[in-house]
Amino acid sequence: MRRKRKLTKRKRGKDFMEEIIQEKISADHLLYVSLKYTKTCDVIINLLIRWKKMIETSTNELLKHAKKKKKIPSIPDNPVGKIDAIKILFKKDANFLEVIEMYEMFRKIEELKKERIGEFRKNVTLKVFYRGEEININLEKLKIYADRLEKFISTTKQFLLS
């Protein structure tokens, strides 16, 4: 009979990071391979959904870690409460807050009014209407999002391994 081994703090943090990094690898494939060859808005939507899952996984683990470190009294049950708790935890990190703002849009991406522009063309654009604004999500915007998420993952890793 095998005995279960307890995972050390560092090992658990690495497991969560592996899960987050796997999501990022899948998202990068959508951005740099699938979108390059198909140039459809469906790929953009799937990419945003993939990023949403990655940010969700990260924020859940960040909140669990913060609770263990007694930086927050409890983990909120609802998604809006979790977002608010994360905003308070990382209020000094501007990039982190930008990613959380992006996440709020990504959460609603499937229900938002969207317009597809230039599908199957070089300048494919998904026009999203969010909070009364018109947001054009094209390849340049996606690369900006990808850079922000890269920094977000780095911050997440530092926090989880602290």
Regions flagged by a language model, labelled:
Residues 27-38, 61, 65, 156-160:
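Secondary-structure edge/capping motif, primarily at the C-terminal ends of alpha-helices
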